[in-house]
Amino acid sequence: MKTHDVQSISIAKPRAEVFAYIANPANLPAWTNAFKSADAERAELVTPNGAVPIRLETRASAEQGTIDWIMTFPDGSVGAAYSRVTEDAGDSSIYSFVLMAPPVPLEALEGALESQKETLATELVSLRKRLEA
């Protein structure tokens, strides 16, 4: 059973600008469907059962272009998402995102990841539109 999905999108903006926007957790609610609110330490995650408060750790390295999020849920389970901004030709960037399966019971894993893959594809388009506007 697959436990991850990798997606990427080209963004017609310089790497530093794309990185700065994505690395700021306060911007997560603007381009994702998953976050109702977010800051440097916590977030409110939107789930099918309503909003859930979580601890959010953003690990960002401008030098490496990496932005990773570690999410700790009220029950102590931990989820993660890993991403990277890479320079492309000219003043463009490539944003790649490794979507990890959510910390859910095994019987729900495949459906949850499939649903999140579709959502991520939409979110990446939203991110590009927002940054290129």
Regions found by a protein language model. Name each.
Residues 1-38:
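Hydrophobic ligand-binding cavity/cleft-lining segments
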Residues 2-8, 53, 66, 78-80, ...:
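Intrinsic-disorder/low-complexity, polar/charged segments enriched in Ser/Thr/Lys/Arg/Asp/Glu/Gln
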Residues 7-9, 54-60, 71, 79-87:
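Hydrophobic/aromatic beta-strand elements that line small-molecule binding cavities or substrate pockets
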Residues 14, 50, 63-64, 74, ...:
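Short strand-connecting beta-turns/loops that link adjacent beta-strands
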Residues 17-22, 28, 58, 69, ...:
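Hydrophobic pocket/interface hotspot
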Residues 39-42, 89:
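Residue-level recognition of beta-strand termini and adjacent short loop/turns
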Residues 43-49, 67-74:
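Short beta-strand segments that buttress and anchor functional surface loops
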Residues 73-133:
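Beta-strand/loop substructures that line and gate deep hydrophobic ligand-binding cavities in soluble
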